[in-house]
Amino acid sequence: MKHAMLLSMLAMMLAANAGAQTSPRQLPETANIRGLLLSAIDSKNGTAEAWLTGPMAVKLKNETKAPPNTRVKVSVSTLQVFRPGCKRLRMTLAMPMHKMLTVKGTMEMFQMYYDLNLCRDGQPPQVSTVGLGAAR
């Protein structure tokens, strides 16, 4: 009897542990996109993620006719490093639980992205010398 109870407890612990491993990791919330972009610039792996809150999230949900409880995920990744503190970043805004009708007639998760060049000081990196020469 004790053996069966011990096996049952062990099975419950293993099931609980397996569920914990498959659950999605918790993301922080932010209304500060600039801070998230700077976090990606500073990050060793060049990425940053958070749930977007505040007026920008509300506007995006209103424009896409998403339900009010829909969450907006912001993911920032590095596409290119120009020099220390200056990167080409891709910021993706997505609503994983909100499906929208596409022009092809399929229902797809809402997702859009922006690519931008940014330095830690807030200025764009100089990636080309075109137009910087003296006028003739």
Where are these regions (language model features)?
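Generic marker of residues within folded, mature protein domains
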Residues: L10, L79-V81, T106
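Sec-dependent signal peptide recognition
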Residues: K2-S8
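Long, C-terminal folded domains that constitute the functional core of proteins
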Residues: R90-T92, R136
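N-terminal secretory signal peptides
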Residues: Q21-P84, R90
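N-terminal signal peptide c-region/cleavage motif recognized by signal peptidases
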Residues: M13-N17
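A short, surface-exposed beta-strand/turn
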Residues: P96-A134
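A structural detector for beta-sheet-dominated domains
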Residues: S75-S77, T92-A94, N117-C119
